[in-house]
Design a protein with these regions (language model features):
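Short, Lys/Arg-enriched N-terminal segments with co-localized hydrophobic residues
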Residues: 5-17
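Rossmann-like NAD(P)(H) cofactor-binding subdomain of soluble oxidoreductases
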Residues: 74, 78-172, 188
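Residues that mark the start of a beta-strand
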Residues: 18-20, 119, 343
Length: 364
């Protein structure tokens, strides 16, 4: 068995090529999906966005993403954005690997050039709020854009508790693919599922996309308690009561938000809570939450983490804005969302951390 970078060369789980999969966006999650995709015997291409130029140059030189500690499986091709057309030639599946900051760019520059018979799977997590207090999924936004062009695509998404570096490490991972057509989802699952990447499939797009987006503010909330305890007791003493107390309240509020979205099923809640857990303990949102809990305001925390993408803050702000509109309408009650509203005050009004513990109690 040959060695590369100190690691065994992969023996593919399927001996014959199955499909051509092109990943557009060389961010960490999109790039991590190249591992199960290639290990299943597919031809895999990664096309960087205009912001990924240095990443692609590094991949071409070293066959490794600069944020990963492991080489890509052999046989992956890398392209700069100018070669997008070449990267899409003969493609069977496209994976959208942009962050929520790239939603408009992806809709304007990538979706229009994908052949209509090619399904798309996106890793982009988030929701967009409207002036009347609705929360829309990114696939819904992209569909509206495509409709205005007279084009149709099969738009699917992946959600669930999965960090990119742990996927690269082949930690056992449970995710859900969602889309409008179950047969298409079965096809995508066949291309991507491995003995460590386990895929559920569902046509409840609103449910999965909402569950994995709604967790953002709550992951920040749990991380606040970590920072507060580090400030009060030092970094060496672990405290879990406060984390667990806020986590439990987060579960309640996420369930109410899923009800608001018409998607309060046990499966959707499980995907969202799992994603909340991994984000608290392995995500970038944890870092900003700890800094806020230690006493920094939001601007100071952002400055401390300069260069770290914090899309979770934007998504949390959008969700809170929609909820406040519905509270004003009388559709929702403020007392049902003490964590979300406090997080919104911290992000938007630079309010100091003052977790409303008494608001979490109940009498039955």
């Amino acid at each position: 068995m040959s060695l590369r970078g100190g690691l065994p060369k992969f023996i593919f789980q399927r001996s014959m090529k199955m499909a051509v999969i092109t990943i557009v966006g060389a961010g960490m999650m999109g790039s991590a999906l190249a591992f199960p995709a290639r290990e299943n015997g597919n031809e895999v291409r990664i096309v960087g966005t205009h912001l990924d130029r240095e990443i692609i140059e590094g991949c071409l030189a070293n066959n490794r993403h600069p944020k990963f500690d492991r080489d890509f499986p052999e046989g992956i091709s890398f392209y700069q954005i100018e070669d997008l057309e070449k990267g899409l030639d003969g493609v069977d599946m496209v994976i959208g690997g942009v962050s929520s900051f790239g939603v408009d760019w992806f809709g304007d520059n990538v979706l229009p050039v994908i052949p209509e018979n090619v399904p798309v799977l996106t890793v982009t997590k988030g929701l967009m709020d409207t002036e009347d207090g609705k929360l829309l999924t990114y696939p819904d936004l992209w569909k509206k854009k495509l409709d205005s062009m007279g084009k149709k695509l099969s738009l699917n998404a992946v959600g669930g508790p999965c960090t990119s570096y742990e996927l690269v490490a082949h930690d056992q991972t449970q995710v859900a693919f969602c889309g409008d057509d179950l047969e298409t989802l079965k096809y995508l699952k066949k291309l991507m599922e491995t003995d460590y990447y386990h895929v559920s499939i569902t046509t409840d797009v609103v449910g999965i996309e909402s569950a994995v987006a709604l967790k953002n503010g709550y992951a920040l909330g749990v991380a606040l308690t970590i920072g507060v305890n580090q400030k009060n007791f030092g970094d060496d003493t672990l405290h879990f009561n406060s984390q667990a107390g806020l986590f439990g309240q987060a579960l309640k509020e996420m369930y109410r938000l899923l009800e608001f979205q018409g998607a309060a099923t046990l499966d959707n809640l499980g995907v969202g809570i799992g994603d909340l857990y991994v984000t608290v303990y392995g995500g970038r949102t944890r870092l900003v939450g700890i800094l806020l809990g230690k006493g920094l305001n939001i601007d100071e925390a952002k400055a401390e983490l300069q260069g770290v993408t914090l899309e979770s803050l934007v998504v949390a702000e959008r969700v809170a804005r929609a909820i406040r509109i519905n509270i004003e309408k009388g559709t929702l009650k403020a007392e049902d969302f003490p964590v979300l509203l406090h997080i919104d005050d911290i992000i938007c009004k630079k309010a100091p951390v003052d977790i409303p513990w008494d608001a979490f109690t109940f009498v039955k």
